Amino acid sequence: MRLATSSLCLFALLLALLIAGCEGKERTSAGRPLDREEMRAAVAEAIRIPDTVEHLARIADLAGRLTAENAEGAADAFDPEIAWVREYDLLPFVHAWTRVDDAAALRRVLEWSSASKRGFGVTEAIYYLALNRDIAKARVHAESITKPRLAEAAMIGLARGWAQSDDLDGLSQYLGRVEQGSIRDQMVRVANGTVALYAGPDRLREWIDGMPAEGLGGLRTRAFRTALGQMAFKDPQWAASWLSDFAGEPFASNMVVAVALPWTERDPHEALAWLHSLPFDDDVAVASRRMATRWIRLDPAAFALSLERAEEGRIRDAMNEAFAMHLVKSAPGAAADRALQIDSSERRIDMLRRILETWGRREPEAATSWLEQADLSDALRQELASRIQSRSGPARAIGASR
């Protein structure tokens, strides 16, 4: 299901402030409560106000005046327009109704005709209940929903609300009992992001590091790998520090690339320096190639300049491999020349095989001409010529007159 976007989160924060202000104002005013029909009419009018500031202020004011007696009136206004009404209009009402009558709110949300709004409403109702009232009750509601998409929506709301509580150990135990699969993965991702946002990255790290290494259905591994990828986009240097604590641990394998790629988006030179600081292994090799590929797409000129200045070694080899593969379709001759710059003979020969096979299928004569002039051993030259011929049909023999 679609999760709330960052812009929606900003609206939610704005609305929360507006609701708090309006509630305080309402408590000090002598205005009488709205009945069901008055609430329906007021909401129907509010959702059509074109000015955004006035629109949001009016919606927040009405949500602050919602009671168990008039909540159905708000729902009566939303129901005919549910397909087009915006989620930030629904959000304060779902929360306010859940506060005064969670069962009625959830029941009405499940009747909405729009599937996307049903999912949104279920997530927000369960979230608000878990956040403000009773995690145990939120669990009962969430677990009572059996339709797959809505069940996922409910569990996401439960994870988000629970993750803002003081009972993260209880959340760990619960996640450990959830069947492994997409729903648990979504819950873990949402819980990680929520803890990082509201309690800070260090609290997220403390929570995951405190999970048992074994048991809970491999929760620690899943939570760590997911959180590392999430935090790498927010603060790659912080993520790199966390990853360094578990160098060599099986559950942290193949995660160098998860830090390197987001870091490349921010500062490829820093990402490259970090890769150079690590002991070279298969993880670093893969990350170096992937980092180089990303950098080439972002700024090929800067990448080429950095490559020319790079120190000899296996990371430079990985960068040369990535550059060669980038060039192979548009400039196969340049790709082959680049492959010759790879220091490792094994990697150099493997890359030449791949390039010449690809080039030979499209332009066997040009590939053969390059091969004739390349500084290669006779044995390798003949092997590569045979590969070209096997994929393109008969070609002139190496060294034959043209």
Residue ranges and their predicted role:
Residues M1-L10:
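Bacterial N-terminal signal peptides that target proteins for export
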